[in-house]
């Protein structure tokens, strides 16, 4: 029996666009799918014709050959036009296809279409102390897990799971058309290689259901915002027994009311009094391990930085510890009584005109004076 024109099979004209071909295929495949027409040989044959037409017409090279030579382009022994030299068999081409598909045209290693589970993301917020020292956190998330009722088979308990009659359990369909070989996911079983007699009532044949899962996550010392922890196999369950995906825990460190962080170093501002800045002394500064004493030299200016070695963050990679960097801020006294104000006035009078007591101010005034001098020239 002569093969029907591929365009006619899909109800299209020869100049149909790829979009038209895909639309027609989806409509007809849904209509004649074997699952909807069980036992109907006519529907099964029609479905095969539709699938074959779709595979040829959606491949640019095959479609061009078909438009020029018709079905003869895909017949063994054809010597039409551009296919001269391939008549009488495939010779070395069969070896090439064997390497590509793992065997000869009719066999080879066939594998089911397995889909690894999706990776999941979980965002977690921790304190700076937890980030620096490490901690354990219990988390709860919702994910697709193996169905307890069917144990991932997708079939109702007590019912059969048979090999798909269309791909014979391979999950993929391979066709030889002339010197072309095509391999695609079986449209009947969608790559599972199985035919489920009665789908599981819990998972509706998917083999997976949505479940809540509790996990304990160990967060190592030294992590920072944006770091990710990968928990292998804790993502969604895979399809048809495929491996589960992974879970990525994304770290977010809360802002601290005292410290800021830059890499392995911690920073803080330490207020000191006007008199201590001038006379020097000793103050207590906070660290994540407790308090420590810091010596303030005489004549300390606001903004001066003091580095405390090893009191920062331990790097999770190198093992070295960063530093704590304290920035001194000299506080201006407020809410002074008259006696205190008078003492400050006396101090101001005693310092007036003596540049060595105000080196920064003197330097600034000299710079301003020079600026206006040059501006007037």
From Swiss-Prot:
Zn(2+) 1 binds at residues 147, 150, 200, 203. GO terms for molecular function: ATP binding; heat shock protein binding; unfolded protein binding; zinc ion binding. GO terms for cellular component: cytoplasm. Its cofactor is Zn(2+). It comes from the Bacteria. Binds 2 Zn(2+) ions per monomer. One of its GO terms (biological process) is response to heat. PANTHER family: CHAPERONE PROTEIN DNAJ, DNAJ HOMOLOG 1, MITOCHONDRIAL-RELATED. This is Chaperone protein DnaJ. It comes from Haemophilus ducreyi (strain 35000HP / ATCC 700724).
């Amino acid at each position: 029996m002569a093969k029907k024109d591929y365009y006619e099979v899909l109800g299209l004209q020869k100049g149909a666009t790829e979009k038209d071909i895909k639309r027609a295929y989806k409509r007809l495949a849904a209509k004649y799918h074997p699952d909807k027409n069980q036992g109907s040989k006519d529907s099964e044959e029609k479905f095969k014709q539709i699938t074959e037409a779709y595979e040829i017409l959606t491949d640019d090279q095959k479609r061009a050959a078909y438009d020029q030579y018709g079905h003869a382009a895909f017949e063994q022994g054809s010597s039409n036009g551009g296919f001269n030299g391939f008549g009488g068999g495939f010779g070395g081409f069969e070896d090439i296809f064997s390497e590509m598909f793992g065997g000869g045209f009719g066999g080879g290693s066939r594998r089911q279409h397995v889909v690894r589970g999706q990776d999941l993301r979980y965002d977690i917020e921790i304190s700076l102390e937890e980030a620096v020292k490490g901690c354990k956190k219990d988390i709860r998330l919702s994910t697709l897990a193996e169905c307890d009722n069917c144990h991932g088979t997708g079939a109702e308990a007590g019912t059969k799971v048979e090999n798909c009659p269309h791909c014979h359990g391979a999950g993929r369909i391979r066709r030889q058309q002339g010197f072309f070989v095509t391999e695609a996911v079986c449209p009947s079983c969608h790559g599972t290689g199985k035919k489920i007699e009665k789908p599981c009532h819990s998972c509706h044949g998917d083999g997976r259901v949505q479940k809540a899962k509790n996990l304990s996550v160990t967060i190592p010392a030294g992590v920072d915002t944006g770091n990710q922890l990968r928990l292998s196999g804790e993502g969604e369950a895979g399809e048809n027994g495929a491996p589960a995906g992974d879970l990525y825990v994304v770290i977010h460190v809360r802002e601290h009311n005292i410290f800021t962080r830059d890499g392995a170093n911690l920073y803080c501002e330490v207020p000191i009094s006007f008199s201590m800045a001038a006379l020097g002394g000793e103050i207590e500064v906070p660290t994540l391990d407790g308090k420590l004493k810091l010596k303030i030299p005489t004549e300390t200016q606001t903004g001066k930085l003091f580095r405390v070695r090893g009191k920062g963050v331990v790097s999770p990679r190198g093992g070295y510890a960063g530093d704590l960097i304290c920035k001194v801020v000299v506080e201006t006294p407020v809410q002074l009584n008259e006696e205190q104000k008078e003492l400050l006035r006396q101090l101001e009078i005693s310092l007036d005109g003596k540049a060595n007591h105000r080196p920064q101010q003197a330097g600034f005034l000299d710079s301003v004076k020079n600026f206006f001098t040059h501006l007037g020239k």
